[in-house]
Swiss-Prot record:
Protein name: Signal recognition particle receptor FtsY
Subcellular location: Cell inner membrane; Cytoplasm
UniProt key word Calcium: no
Domain of life the protein comes from: Bacteria
Record keywords, A-Z: Cell inner membrane, Cell membrane, Cytoplasm, GTP-binding, Hydrolase, Membrane, Nucleotide-binding, Receptor
Primary gene name: ftsY
GO molecular function: GTP binding; GTPase activity; signal recognition particle binding
Disulphide bond pairs: none
Subunit structure of this chain's protein: Part of the signal recognition particle protein translocation system, which is composed of SRP and FtsY. SRP is a ribonucleoprotein composed of Ffh and a 4.5S RNA molecule.
Length: 293
């Protein structure tokens, strides 16, 4: 699943790594490999500080589990269960992270569960974003609520949820703008949208998911923190993990934001969304580290 780890190890070693597994690796070499995965350095220090000079696969696995499962060091939150109908998902993230495509993927999952879905084109200042969501709606046969360019996105969110209530829709997915260059305005806009969602839902809970570009590495955390501070996010979906991603951002999100990673976007098709599996993630990372030379 996480082949990018093995690619990075091969690059660090300067040759195609053999499949034979090593029994241990020196701490300095392990540190170099983890840096190559684009895992932030303070996280690496925390992982390795209680380990010896030679580290076994089991020792690394246990250290990683402490971060992603919760230990005395940090408690990872789990996605809260919401039973409200319609179940509203407010989707946020910077432009280019893959919000619109991810919304289509989430809607496709909803359809597979025999649920009725509705989409809201809340990035009202970008005609291209609205058009893209409408095209996905046509492809998936899902209605898209939209408004004229430049309309108030909060009103769009309100109308989308009102329509969902009237039509007995199960799940709603609302797109949003992601103009971080105008950070203050964006934060105010997102806060207003969230308040509007709460109002029309009569204070019933709803999900706020961040779409994070996996190719950004640790630098994407700065963006993520802004959204989390603004909205108190419920979870993260990481995209573009089929390309140049180094994978380390996954650990960094768990470590820094203490938010669950829900799905991974592994391509551009509506089915290219897989549930994040912590055990498989750790297993693949450890396997890549201990590939023989």
């Amino acid at each position: 699943m996480f082949n990018f780890f093995k690619k990075i190890v091969n690059k660090i070693k300067g040759e195609e790594a053999k499949e034979k597994k090593r029994q241990s690796v020196p701490k300095e070499e392990l540190e170099e490999i983890l840096i190559g995965f684009d895992i932030q350095y303070d996280l690496i220090e925390s992982l390795l500080k209680h380990l010896g000079d030679l580290i076994t696969p089991k020792q690394l696995e246990v250290a990683l589990l402490r971060f992603v499962r919760g230990d005395s060091y940090y408690d990872k939150t789990r996605l809260k269960t919401i039973t409200t109908k319609p179940l509203v998902h407010l989707i946020v993230g910077v432009n280019g992270a893959g919000k619109t495509t991810t919304i289509a993927k989430l809607a496709k999952l909803s359809l597979k569960q025999h649920k009725k879905a509705l989409l809201g084109a809340g990035d009202t200042f970008r005609a291209a974003a609205v058009k893209q969501l409408q095209l996905w709606g046509e492809k998936l046969n899902i209605q898209v609520i939209s408004a004229k360019e430049g309309s108030d996105p909060s009103s769009l969110a309100y109308n989308t949820i009102e329509s969902a209530i009237a039509k007995n829709i199960d799940e709603v997915f609302i797109d949003t703008a992601g103009r971080l260059h105008n950070q203050t305005n964006l934060k105010n806009e997102l806060s207003k949208i969230a308040r509007t969602c709460s109002k029309v839902l009569k204070d019933a809970p709803f999900y706020k998911f961040l779409i994070l570009d996996g190719t950004q590495g640790s630098s994407g955390l700065t963006q993520a923190k802004i959204f989390h501070e603004t909205l108190a996010l419920d979870g993260v979906i990481m995209t573009k993990l089929d390309g140049t991603s180094k994978g380390g951002a996954i650990l960094s999100v768990l470590y820094e934001l203490k938010l669950p990673i829900l799905y991974l976007g592994m391509g551009e098709k509506e089915d290219d969304l897989i549930a994040f599996d912590e055990e498989r993630f750790i297993e693949d990372l450890v396997d890549a580290v201990f590939v023989g030379q």
